[in-house]
Amino acid sequence: MSARVLMVQGCTSDAGKSTLVAALCRWLHRQGIAVAPFKPQNMALNSAVTVDGGEIGRAQALQAQACGLDPQTDFNPVLLKPNSDTGAQVIVHGQPVATLDAVGYHAYKATAFKAVLASHERLVERFDVVLVEGAGSPAEINLRANDIANMGYAEAVDCAVILVADIDRGGVFAHLVGTLALLSASERARVAGVVINRFRGDLALLQPGLEWLERETGKPVLGVLPYLHGLQLDAEDAVPRNAPQKPQSQLRVVVPVLPRISNHTDIDALLAHPQVDVRLIGPGQTPPPCDLILLPGSKSTRHDLQWLRTHGWDAAIARHLRYGGKLLGICGGLQMLGTHLHDPDGIEGAAGSSPGLGWLPLQTTLQPHKQLHRVHGRLLLGDAGVSGYEIHCGISSGAALARPLLQLDDGRTDGAISDDGQVLGTYVHGVFDHPQALAALLAWAGLAQAAPLDLAALREASLERLADAVHTHLDTAALTRLISREAACST
């Protein structure tokens, strides 16, 4: 029997689509329902490696966790990873197929939609319920033609839609009414109800507005979700705007916010740790004194390496190391730490070579075949367990690799430790997520007595809080009817 399909679309980007789908996934999973997440098309630089050796958006990996599933490529069949202001790497069913500009991708959409529908068909045959996340807003007029991410998908598979809006930003009624007004009649009929997200305050004061909204639009308000503080969930793309300041912390970490930063979820455990103060430094900001500089991943490593030089980071890093500070590079950050970075085929932009920062004796050549691995092993610094994933096109070689940072269970080694022990590099994302590895790396950086922190447990607790919020604040009877197809969409 085919699954029931329900889609969540948003009035804006960051309205709460990913979070609401994750919440609904865990709510259904707790009831013993076989549920799967799905996002037809995603644009994000934070990605995850699947059990079948592919790449999907991190939001869908988190939603899979909410369903009690390992991440699979069918959960996000089309992933766009921007590598310039006008172009993106196109990943279909987990594998890169092309790098296209906006015009090129528009022409490719018909092919991409076939991949979307193929994944959809497989999922509806395997699961009882498929919860679908839209992208951006369904009311983007310039993107309506050949849409595969929002109403184009919903109409093709004939599913109901919930529309979510973020009240914390202000203008929630304008967002909802305006979005509905810009939909076609058939699209509007698919919207079965609306959810208001991130509400703070007295719900009684909002009630007159909710009643007006239902009269004005003819759509039921399915609930108002409160602003949930302290959730530990993977960000899909945006770097945290307000990293919590911890003036009494015992370890200071500085991270440059690279223009093409990717998989910045690597710092989530550091952001959550009570003894670690993370400072995210953007253009025009001077790096403050710290114990550790962390160079994150990048989707355009040579471009971001030049950005570091332009903004004086090469001198800042040299000064930091001269005074005894520590330096860690992850994935693209590791490549930057070497002596040279070669891109002969233009994998990440214009073909060419760039000198590295020169803190590790290794060089990297970018190659068309992307390395995608989920890994487990030991951190040789402190002999701690570690797990994570690799997503990179670079192949590194050189003397630095004779002193690896990780011994992997598949027999490979990874990364490097400098001769003086001040500089580390690794291709493995998520290296801080394992409690043992986190403690060992914090000790290396200068925090000898680190409080234990289990990021996976924090994520699980956050998913449970989301499911509790659905149970408490949404009309679960109406949601059950929608999922069971006992109620037609409102008109």
UniProtKB/Swiss-Prot annotation:
The keyword Cytoplasm is annotated on this UniProt entry: no
Organism of provenance: Xanthomonas axonopodis pv. citri (strain 306)
All residue ranges annotated as the GATase cobBQ-type domain in the record: 250-437
UniProt-recorded Gene Ontology molecular function terms: ABC-type vitamin B12 transporter activity; catalytic activity
SUPFAM superfamilies to which the protein is assigned, alphabetical: Class I glutamine amidotransferase-like (SSF52317), P-loop containing nucleoside triphosphate hydrolases (SSF52540)
Signal peptide (from-to): none
Pathway where this protein functions: Cofactor biosynthesis; adenosylcobalamin biosynthesis
One GO BP annotation of this record: cobalamin biosynthetic process
UniProtKB keywords: Cobalamin biosynthesis, Glutamine amidotransferase
Identification of the protein by name: Cobyric acid synthase
Family: Belongs to the CobB/CobQ family. CobQ subfamily.
Organism lineage string: Bacteria, Pseudomonadati, Pseudomonadota, Gammaproteobacteria, Lysobacterales
Active site: 331 (nucleophile), 429
Keyword Repeat: no
Functional description taken from the UniProt entry: Catalyzes amidations at positions B, D, E, and G on adenosylcobyrinic A,C-diamide. NH(2) groups are provided by glutamine, and one molecule of ATP is hydrogenolyzed for each amidation.
Pfam families (alphabetical): CbiA (PF01656), GATase_3 (PF07685)
Gene name of the encoded protein: cobQ
